[in-house]
Amino acid sequence: MKKLVIKSAIYFFFILLVLEVIVRIFHLGKDTPARFLDSYEVEKWKPNQNGFSVTGNRRQNFSEYHINSSGYNSYREFTPTKDKIEVALVGDSFIEGFHQNYYNSIGKKIETKIPKIEVYEYGYAGYDFADQLHLVHSYKKQFDLIDHVILGIKFSNDLTRGEYNIMRGRLDLESPINKLLKKSKLLVYCKSIGVLDPPQELIYRIRKTLRPQQKDAAIDKNEALRIQQENEKKYLENFKSLVSKYNYDKKRFTLLLDSRITNSTFLSYLKKNNFTYIDFATSFEASKKSTTLIYDRHWNNHGRNLIAKTIIEHLTTIKIFR
């Protein structure tokens, strides 16, 4: 019996080893760059990293990323000067672009059409409006040299707070245990395709059983509407607070948004108070092709082409070219 257990353990180990090799050879497990908090308390990726972002159990999306010396996914370094024309794209994972090869990003698409300018992409998954303005404020000397800054914003989740503070949730992913676990591509792959979901759910249920909580009372439609209206009011106040605190430059800054999913009161406020914004809703609605990936709502290559085109039209309108 003892020999059987030992042999089984050895076979199991070798099976795991073979699977680990297969996952690595075929790049089934994604590479996740390390993140950190810099001296300005700006959360970003550690500079000078390369790897591949993989999504789906059949490698539905496979793209290469390159973290530059500034800590962002881009094919170029950020070196603004008074002698060049630069545009900054600031935002979350949609700007970060891990779903597309870094050398075929939105910024690169814009530069291909307008060789006169350099586009700097300050994209980081999870950035909200507070993160973005804190970044711009922290690197003021750099951003003051950039001719135009475009900030991506989604009303429903980018304005949930009215001031910047460090969000430890993402940084906790850099704990020693998580770093150790990420060294196994097999484990990373299993987690990405949901193999580890059942045991995690079992642990959650056991904890819930041991610590019974009161059930939340059902919310009727009127109450849900009231909560929604309160949140929308709060988000608008948060926006006002942030643009005031960080001295938002209306002449040089432009918001990038989708009016289809943006609160009408917020849009009215932007127009009334002369906040410039780029609305890509029309181009997306008119598109006969899908603008998003199959497995999530991030823009696909066609969607990114439309975003780049919309930004180019805006830059042409404001006559950024000298």
Each model region followed by its residue ranges:
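Conserved, well-ordered alpha-helix/loop/beta-strand core segments that scaffold catalytic motifs
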Residues: 148-159, 211-285
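Hydrophobic membrane-insertion alpha-helices, especially the h-region
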Residues: 7-24
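Histidine-centered active-site loop/cap adjacent to the catalytic His
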Residues: 5, 295-322
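Short beta->alpha junction loops
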Residues: 121-128
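Conserved beta-strand elements of the Class I
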Residues: 86-90, 120, 147-149
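Membrane/wall-proximal cationic-aromatic binding patches
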Residues: 28-114, 286-287
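Interaction-surface signature
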Residues: 32-36, 40-42, 129-227
